[in-house]
């Protein structure tokens, strides 16, 4: 029996928001390590402590056109709201989660960018974006910066600590719809309204590659966990894989019948997932570049997809206001 036959819809949450859900994330907060205790006897007791106390906290984050962000926990097969975050006055466009899983960044149609504590639901700070439209977000791998695309074709780099804009990378192009930071911290990639992809060297702050493989808007892009590949998704219905260092096209993936709105790699780097306006979620194998499975459980376009930290589950969100969680065994 093929492992793909074991893929199934684990949970569906209808009407999770009052309007379309545009973005999602999956946070994994690891427990704080206990300080080393000098007394050996006490140390032995701490080592024998209940392992359940050491388990990570897993949260699903969703942002909607209803201006609301929700932090969910999966308990006993049910999705339960832990926090409802209110601070944006218009629809939530993008959410990004810091590498340690503790901090959430959110952007909105109201041009605001807000940082939140995921575990407590507390608003940490509102970034100083000025009058610039902020769009898709990503964290730097060290968690010190948040990057955003903008309507002016620029990539904005904000300091998490100060809340201020530290740097701007000019793509000299159209509206920057999507941005991604490479996991090794060396590159930032952007996708534009005209289908052009730019790759910048972070240290030098300069453009190193321009990729012109798509003819329509790039709504999502992401780096592979080893930072060697860049995956792009476009309204032309295709996805493309590029070798980051040499900017060579490694492959074109087709299968969606309409716009590809969201893509994400699995943390183990073996698979990636795509969501489309054709209402499907597709799981792809990186080695073969073949589609492993197609989920057809949404009734409208799929705006967001993400893997969990174990790479064995996927969350998707849609215009149909629902959240789907799929079991995708390794």
Region locations from a protein language model:
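WD40/WD-repeat beta-propeller blade N-cap
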Residues: 14-21, 85-92, 128-134, 170-176, ...
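Short loop/turn segments that connect beta-strands within beta-propeller blades
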Residues: 74-77, 118-121, 160-163, 202-205, ...
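Residue-level detector of Asp-centered blade-edge/turn motifs that repeat once per structural unit
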Residues: 28-33, 54-56, 99-100, 141-142, ...
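WD40-repeat beta-propellers
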Residues: 69-73, 113-116, 155-158, 197-200, ...
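Conserved strand-to-loop turn within each blade of WD40 beta-propeller repeats
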Residues: 63-66, 107-110, 149-152, 191-194, ...
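Blade-level signature of beta-propeller repeat domains, shared across WD40, Kelch, NHL, RCC1
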Residues: 303-330
């Amino acid at each position: 029996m093929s492992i793909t036959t074991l893929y199934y819809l684990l949970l569906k949450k209808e009407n999770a928001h009052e309007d379309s859900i545009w973005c999602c994330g999956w946070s994994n907060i690891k427990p704080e390590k206990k300080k080393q205790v000098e007394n050996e006897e006490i140390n032995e007791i701490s080592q024998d402590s209940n392992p359940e106390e050491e388990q990570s906290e897993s949260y699903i984050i969703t942002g909607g056109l209803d201006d609301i962000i929700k932090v969910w926990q999966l308990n006993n097969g049910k999705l339960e709201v832990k926090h409802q975050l209110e601070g944006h006055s218009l629809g939530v466009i993008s959410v990004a989660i810091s590498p340690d899983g503790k901090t959430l960044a959110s952007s909105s149609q109201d041009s605001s960018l807000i940082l939140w504590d995921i575990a407590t639901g507390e608003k940490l700070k509102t970034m100083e974006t000025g009058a610039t439209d902020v769009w898709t977000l990503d964290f730097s791998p060290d968690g010190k910066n948040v990057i955003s695309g903008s309507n002016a074709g620029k990539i904005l780099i904000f300091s998490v600590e100060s809340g201020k804009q530290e740097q701007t990378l000019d793509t000299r192009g159209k509206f920057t719809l999507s941005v991604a930071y490479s996991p090794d911290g060396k590159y930032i990639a952007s996708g534009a309204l005209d289908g052009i992809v730019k790759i910048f060297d972070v240290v030098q702050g300069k453009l190193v590659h321009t990729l012109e493989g798509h003819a329509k808007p790039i709504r999502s892009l992401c780096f592979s966990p080893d930072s060697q590949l860049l995956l792009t998704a476009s309204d032309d219905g295709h996805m493309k894989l590029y070798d980051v260092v040499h900017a060579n096209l490694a492959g074109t993936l087709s299968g969606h019948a309409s716009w590809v709105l969201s893509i994400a790699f699995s943390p183990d780097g073996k698979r990636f997932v795509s969501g489309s306006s054709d209402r499907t979620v597709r799981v792809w194998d990186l080695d073969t570049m073949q589609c492993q499975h197609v989920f057809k459980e949404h009734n409208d376009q799929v705006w967001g997809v993400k893997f969990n930290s174990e790479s064995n589950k996927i969350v998707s969100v849609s215009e149909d206001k629902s959240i789907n969680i799929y079991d995708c065994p390794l």
